[in-house]
Amino acid sequence: MKVVLQRVSEASVDVVNELGTLDPTFEPQQIGPGFMILVGVTDGDGDKQIAWLAHKILNLRVFEDAQGKMNRSIQDIGGEILSISQFTLFADVHKGNRPSFIKAGKPEHADLMWIKFNEALRSGGVPVKEGRFGAHMRVGLVNDGPVTIVIDTEHDMPDGTR
């Protein structure tokens, strides 16, 4: 799994239908202070990656304490998460000018892993709002910092836990 995590003061998502207008079947989602997370899944991802990544995100100390030092987690500040499924995080641009997405997980697997990941975050007591898997979305956010962190379980998880 790969995530791009951004600390935000607010973020929102809505879904656009094939006519280019807002999809009335999707209720726009918005959060206040917390994280907007783009989430990419590969076919090799499973419960171990989900558990490790959710724990890492829930405990990541990137919010300032009273002294202005990054020393507080999203749980500490009572923050929220906006989770957006994003297969393009696994784009391969080595050859030609059109990215290849063959490293991204198959939709059925990726959707299930994304759902499980969001539930793992919720189990940490943090409210999680979601976009819609596979949809054309408009995501808005106000970066706080900015603080942007990329976490890739393939490279960042300790070897014994993969």
Curated annotation (Swiss-Prot):
InterPro entries: Daa-tRNA_deacyls_DTD (IPR003732), DTD-like_sf (IPR023509)
Localization: Cytoplasm
UniProt short sequence motif Gly-cisPro motif, important for rejection of L-amino acids, positions renumbered to this chain: 145-146
Keyword tags: Cytoplasm, Hydrolase, RNA-binding, tRNA-binding
Coarse class of the protein's main subcellular location: cytoplasm
The keyword Nuclease is assigned to this record: no
Catalytic reaction(s) noted: glycyl-tRNA(Ala) + H2O = tRNA(Ala) + glycine + H(+); a D-aminoacyl-tRNA + H2O = a tRNA + a D-alpha-amino acid + H(+)
Pfam annotation, one family: Tyr_Deacylase
Gene Ontology biological-process annotations: D-amino acid catabolic process
GO CC list: cytoplasm
Record keyword Hydrolase present: yes
EC number: 3.1.1.96
GO molecular function: D-tyrosyl-tRNA(Tyr) deacylase activity; Gly-tRNA(Ala) deacylase activity; Ser(Gly)-tRNA(Ala) hydrolase activity; tRNA binding
UniProt note: domains: A Gly-cisPro motif from one monomer fits into the active site of the other monomer to allow specific chiral rejection of L-amino acids.
Subunit composition and interactions: Homodimer.
Protein family: Belongs to the DTD family.
HAMAP family, alphabetized: Deacylase_Dtd
NCBIfam families, per the entry: D-aminoacyl-tRNA deacylase
PANTHER family, per database record: D-AMINOACYL-TRNA DEACYLASE 1, D-TYROSYL-TRNA TYR DEACYLASE
Function text: An aminoacyl-tRNA editing enzyme that deacylates mischarged D-aminoacyl-tRNAs. Also deacylates mischarged glycyl-tRNA(Ala), protecting cells against glycine mischarging by AlaRS. Acts via tRNA-based rather than protein-based catalysis; rejects L-amino acids rather than detecting D-amino acids in the active site. By recycling D-aminoacyl-tRNA to D-amino acids and free tRNA molecules, this enzyme counteracts the toxicity associated with the formation of D-aminoacyl-tRNA entities in vivo and helps enforce protein L-homochirality.
Name the UniProt record assigns to this protein: D-aminoacyl-tRNA deacylase
Source species: Bifidobacterium longum (strain NCC 2705)
Gene responsible for this protein: dtd
